[in-house]
Amino acid sequence: MRLQDIDVTGFETLLLDRDGVVNRLRPDDYVKKWEEFEFLPGVLEILKAWNTHFKYIFIVTNQRGVGKEIMSEEDLKHIHERMISEVKNYGGRIDRIYYCTALTDSDINRKPGIGMFLQILRDYPDIDKAKCLMIGDSDSDIKFAKNCGIVGIKVI
């Protein structure tokens, strides 16, 4: 399914994976700096359209490149600041980005672990889990949604 084809009716909170959903994947590599970041076609348009639909829009992303010291956390924060700015300039929004830099899959914060979702619920206690939608491009993203007890949709 393509991002543009998803029916978001009835959902108030959107969780998006970053790499492969918002931006182009770098095969066997990481997006280490802004110059390597490339929005996928149609993403800016759909985020603009969804701006008024969703109460909250979050990014939840595993960023193992920081844990591997291929890039710094400051590099990651700079990429995210620029991404949020570009989305905002286009008329969309991202309310907050949650990321995990852990190397081990056993870390609760690393998807499919539920740590990032638990943090979202702590930070935004008015969120209704029944009205949350997770969109990702990997089996791990969909397993994350299932583990959180929310709807997950896989895009290709």
Curated annotation (Swiss-Prot):
The record marks R110 as: Contributes to substrate recognition. GO terms for molecular function: metal ion binding; phosphatase activity. It holds the Pfam family PNK3P. Gene3D superfamilies: HAD superfamily/HAD-like. The active site is at D17, D19. Substrate binds at D17, R18, D19, T61, N62, Q63, R64, R110, K111. It comes from the Bacteria. It is found in: Cytoplasm. Keywords: Capsule biogenesis/degradation, Carbohydrate metabolism, Cytoplasm, Hydrolase, Magnesium, Metal-binding. One of its GO terms (cellular component) is cytoplasm. It is an enzyme of class 3 (hydrolase). The record marks T61, K111 as: Stabilizes the phosphoryl group. Its cofactor is Mg(2+). It catalyses: D-glycero-alpha-D-manno-heptose 1,7-bisphosphate + H2O = D-glycero-alpha-D-manno-heptose 1-phosphate + phosphate. Monomer. Belongs to the gmhB family. This is D-glycero-alpha-D-manno-heptose-1,7-bisphosphate 7-phosphatase. It comes from Bacteroides thetaiotaomicron (strain ATCC 29148 / DSM 2079 / JCM 5827 / CCUG 10774 / NCTC 10582 / VPI-5482 / E50).
